[in-house]
Structure formats: C-alpha cells, structure tokens
Amino acid sequence: MKTKNNIALIGFMGAGKSSISKLLSEKLGKPLVSTDACIETREGLSISHIFKENGEDYFRQMESKVLEDICQNPNQIIDCGGGIVTRPHNLSIMRLNCLVVYLESRPEDLENRLKNHTNRPLFNAERSDKMLKLLESRLPLYRDAADITVSTHNKSCHEVCEEIEDSLRKYENTSG
C-alpha cells in the first residue's frame, strides 16, 4: 500500500488553510505547495480573474490537473483551494496520495474572516446566505474526505498547528 506522506489541508475559504499550512510546513520541515498559487502561475492570472473570464468549471479542471501534478511528489504540505472537494476525481487523488486534514470552522468565524477580503471569487459580504448555502453543500464533502478534523474556533494558527501535529502522531501510531 502506498504511504500517504503528503498532508493536504482542506476547508472552506477563510478557514485558515494558507496561514496554517505555511506554519505547518515550517514546523515539519516539508515544502509547501498551494493549489491556487500553482494555478495562478500556470495561467498567469489571479484566481478571481480566472473565475471571471473562464468560469468555475474551467477553474475546477485546472485545479484537478494541478492536484495530480502536485501529488507526483512526496512529503509536501498541500494548501488546497476551498472547493477542491467538489470534484470526485480530486477526492480520489487525495485519498491515494495524502493524509487529509479538514480545518473545520464555524460559519460566523468564516464570515468575520471573509468580510474584509475582496479577492474571494465566491464570496461577497452582502451575500452571507450564499456563503452559508455553499458551506452547507460542502460540509459532507469535507467530512468525508478528512482523515483528521481539527476545529479552528477560538484558536490561533499556532494552536491549530499543534493540534494537527498531535493528531498526525496519533494517526501514524494507529495506522502504521
């Protein structure tokens, strides 16, 4: 059986995936790869511009290709885009190649984090009902994909990172 030596962080936009994956990368001494950053590099465009010009379907296709390419290399921390779980193909890739950590966040926490960001293609502060519906539709996908779930509520990035490290040790002891 193939070892799941990549660690993929998943969760809704605003869950803290980018900040926490950066810190986790530093603490574990593993390179950090962001699916969104790889897409922006390949396309030469920002994520919001790709959504606007080419649509979500095109973006999701690019995201799948990037995830496949990233998973060709071992021992990485992968910062996944919030919607990566929406394609079954991506879930299969992650299950084969990654230990998946779901950063679970409460809707009110997400809303507070997102309301000041203008570069979120699927979020607008005036449409929190849309965010709630989107989150609700993705929750079962996040939970199903996760090997480990860590709540981010009322925790600093360092606290979440420590909890992930503890969970990784427990996971390795029970699965190895």
Curated annotation (Swiss-Prot):
Residues that, per the record, bind substrate: 36, 60, 82, 138
Q: In which pathway does it act?
A: Metabolic intermediate biosynthesis; chorismate biosynthesis; chorismate from D-erythrose 4-phosphate and phosphoenolpyruvate: step 5/7
GO annotation, biological process:
amino acid biosynthetic process; aromatic amino acid family biosynthetic process; chorismate biosynthetic process
Q: Which branch of life, at top level?
A: Bacteria
One MF term from GO for this chain?
ATP binding
Residue positions annotated to bind ATP are 14-19, 120
Chief location bin: cytoplasm
Q: State the UniProt keywords alphabetically.
A: Amino-acid biosynthesis, Aromatic amino acid biosynthesis, ATP-binding, Cytoplasm, Kinase, Magnesium, Metal-binding, Nucleotide-binding, Transferase
Q: What is its EC number?
A: 2.7.1.71
Q: Which reaction does it catalyse?
A: shikimate + ATP = 3-phosphoshikimate + ADP + H(+)
The cross-references to Pfam families, in alphabetical order and at most eight, read: SKI
Q: Which GO terms describe its cellular component?
A: cytosol
- Binding, Mg(2+): 18
Cofactor notes: Binds 1 Mg(2+) ion per subunit.
Localization, per the record, is: Cytoplasm
Q: Which cofactor does it need?
A: Mg(2+)
Question: Subunit comment for this entry?
Answer: Monomer.
Q: Which family does it belong to?
A: Belongs to the shikimate kinase family.
Q: What does this protein do?
A: Catalyzes the specific phosphorylation of the 3-hydroxyl group of shikimic acid using ATP as a cosubstrate.
Name of this protein: Shikimate kinase
Identify the gene encoding this protein.
aroK
